[in-house]
Amino acid sequence: MNMNKYIDHTLLKPDATQEMIDKLCQEAREHDFMSVCVNPYWVKRSAELLAGSDVKVCTVIGFPLGASTIESKAAETRDAIANGATEVDMVLNVGALKSGDLETVKKDIAAVKQAAGDILLKVILETCLLTEEEKVVACKLSVEAGADYVKTSTGFSTGGATVEDIALMRKTVGPNVGVKASGGVRDGETAVAMIEAGASRIGTSSGVSIVTGAKTTGSGY
């Protein structure tokens, strides 16, 4: 298993500095990770640092609450792509979902997909806030709206990825849509368990320690 190609090497802390972003990109190049995942402000620098490599530049949209408007999420997506983003992870409108406003949830995702075009779109469900039924509904709406991936968590709420949620999401979306585990994946054992449950991507700040087998001090995003 080439674990490095499962990893979105992630740094989304609000106090991330330029030095920390530079180190993230250097590590991603060194270990040939699938992507770096950074806040929109750092997309342009990350794209410049990773130019000529295979490492993709992923950013987050409507992050971390998902409660911004459809229009603002679409605009944020266009801006991120203009700055060099090659993947986007948007946060689902959790409040709309829990209110039963499924039309808004779907329109929200579809608007970001339209803005993203051919850019890979992952939809963050924030599974720790959802019932089992809501997780299934969220997966189905994401697929219907054109998402390429569904993703467990922002890493900023009450919980992260679980093997059970990954298995449920994989079962719901089928074999042709990606599933990303994020939040609390801090070691190789956990990463392998997520992959065996159906994850096709791992979002973590502990990517280096996962691929090298070292003990981690990462946040486990």
From Swiss-Prot:
The keyword Zinc does not apply. Gene3D superfamilies: Aldolase class I. Its main location: cytoplasm. One of its GO terms (biological process) is deoxyribonucleotide catabolic process. Pfam families: DeoC. It is found in: Cytoplasm. InterPro entries: Aldolase_TIM, DeoC, DeoC/FbaB/LacD_aldolase, DeoC_typeI. Pathway: Carbohydrate degradation; 2-deoxy-D-ribose 1-phosphate degradation; D-glyceraldehyde 3-phosphate and acetaldehyde from 2-deoxy-alpha-D-ribose 1-phosphate: step 2/2. The active site is at residues 89, 151, 180. Belongs to the DeoC/FbaB aldolase family. DeoC type 1 subfamily. HAMAP family: DeoC_type1. This is Deoxyribose-phosphate aldolase.
